[in-house]
C-alpha cells in the first residue's frame, strides 16, 4: 500500500537495465538527448505499483512500439514509453566503421536482453559458442538479426541529427486538450476585462 513500493522495486530493475538520466561526458564527448529518459523510469515505477504481469512487463519493453491498440485512432503511449529500455543502450557515436558501431550497439542490446531477461551472458556467443551456457553463435546471430532489422535513430548529436518523436496522445485527445485550452484562454480574456473594469473605478 505504500506509495514508495514501486520506487523501491523499480530501482532494482533500473539498475539491471543500466538506466541513467545522463552520460559521463568524459567517456562520451558527444551531446546526447536524455530529456525524455524519465518517462521510462516513471513507467517502470508505475508498472510495479500496478503489479503489471511479468510477461506484459517484458513484452512492452521489447516490442511496445509494435503493440497496436484495439482502436486505431488511439495511441498506446504506455507501450511506446516502455521501449525506452532499448533506447538507453550504450551507444557511442563517432566510430569510423559504421557497420562495427552498429554491430557493437546490437551486441549491447543482446547483452542487456540476456542479462536482464534470461540471467545469461549471451554476448559471449558473439565470437564463440558459450563455454558454460547452452548458447551457440547461431543462437546469438539469430537474435542479432532481429536487432539488426531495427533502424537506429540516435537523436540529435550537436544539433545535426533529427530526433524522431512519437506522439503520446491521439488526435482526439489533442483536440480535446486544445478545446479546453481555447475555452480557458477565452475565460482568461473575460477575467482580465473584469479586472480592468474594477481597477478603473
Locate predicted features.
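Short, structured secondary-structure elements
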Residues: 1-172
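Long, non-membrane, amphipathic alpha-helices that form coiled-coils
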Residues: 167-201
